[in-house]
């Protein structure tokens, strides 16, 4: 089995920075219906406290010959605004509430919020 980490990077979300908690949690529920809750995690892509030069560096590799703005534009190449319900790591509390409200029980919610990743990596042998 594998894992799918649901990204919270605004450019990856329905309605980008305006994505609602309910919409995000509904996406997770649909994925659980397809592949099972044990294969789902959160891949926050959270990058706080860094200047915009960091995202510019990430989008332009050492050998890039032209400027790449990724999902951004020349006019707005900075980090996108996070959804209001996940501006930093404290947003995991909002995710917990949202997942419970959408119908996940406590064990499933804890699995999605970290236990599944832990168990996945624990199972990898060198």
Model-identified regions with their sequence ranges:
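Short acidic/histidine-rich active-site segments
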Residues: 8, 35-81, 85
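Flexible loop/turn segments at secondary-structure boundaries
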Residues: 11-15, 48-51, 118-120
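Catalytic pocket-lining loop regions of alpha/beta-barrel enzymes
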Residues: 1-40
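Conserved, mostly hydrophobic/aromatic
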Residues: 4, 45, 109
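Mid-to-C-terminal alpha-helical segments outside catalytic/metal-binding sites
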Residues: 77-126
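Hydrophobic alpha-helix feature that most strongly marks membrane-spanning transmembrane helices
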Residues: 2, 29-36, 51, 100, ...
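Short, electropositive alpha-helical surface patch
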Residues: 20-33, 57-70, 96, 125-126
């Amino acid at each position: 089995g594998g894992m799918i980490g649901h990204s919270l990077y605004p450019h990856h979300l329905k309605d980008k920075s305006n994505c609602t908690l309910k919409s995000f949690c509904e996406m997770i529920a649909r994925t659980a219906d397809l592949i099972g809750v044990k294969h789902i995690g959160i891949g926050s892509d959270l990058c706080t406290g860094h200047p915009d030069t960091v995202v510019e560096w990430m989008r332009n590799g050492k050998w890039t010959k032209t400027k790449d703005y990724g999902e951004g534009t020349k006019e707005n190449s900075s980090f996108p605004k996070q959804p209001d319900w996940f501006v930093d790591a404290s947003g995991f509390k909002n995710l917990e509430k949202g997942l419970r409200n959408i119908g996940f029980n406590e064990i499933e919610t804890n699995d999605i919020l970290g236990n599944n990743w832990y168990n996945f990596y624990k199972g990898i042998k060198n």
